[in-house]
């Protein structure tokens, strides 16, 4: 069986747990196996994967930019739960202006969205996998 459409939900931060890095490795493996990764929904602490200000040490894997590159190369939609993101200090330019915040820090390639994006992925993908 090949060519399935997948959606992922990532609930772990970019650093500190294995959830996000395992999700990224899974994403790479399923794409390399001929499947289609439609979207990734970052929820709870997973929204920290979209923080543009994350700066890993030189000898560490840059997971934030790796997600961005994966999205660019394979047309993967990177959705970030807007409510969870705002609670954790992550915002795009529009929300920053609406809330009178000093700056935005959402990594390019990621999009703030609601739970509707997760529901849509669950309805349209053959498989949803949570990390």
Swiss-Prot record:
Entry keyword tRNA processing: yes
Subcellular location: Cytoplasm
Listed GO MF terms: sulfur carrier activity; sulfurtransferase activity
Enzyme class: transferase
A single GO BP: tRNA wobble position uridine thiolation
Paired cysteines (S-S): none
Coiled-coil portions: none
Keyword terms: Cytoplasm, Transferase, tRNA processing
The EC number(s) this enzyme carries: 2.8.1.-
SUPFAM superfamilies: DsrEFH-like
Keyword Transmembrane on entry: no
Active site: 81
Superkingdom of the organism of origin: Bacteria
Pfam families linked: DsrE
Annotated Gene Ontology cellular component terms: sulfurtransferase complex
Oligomer status and interactors: Heterohexamer, formed by a dimer of trimers. The hexameric TusBCD complex contains 2 copies each of TusB, TusC and TusD. The TusBCD complex interacts with TusE.
Function in brief: Part of a sulfur-relay system required for 2-thiolation of 5-methylaminomethyl-2-thiouridine (mnm(5)s(2)U) at tRNA wobble positions. Accepts sulfur from TusA and transfers it in turn to TusE.
Family assignment from sequence similarity: Belongs to the DsrE/TusD family.
Protein name as catalogued: Sulfurtransferase TusD
Organism: Yersinia enterocolitica serotype O:8 / biotype 1B (strain NCTC 13174 / 8081)
Name of the gene this protein is made from: tusD
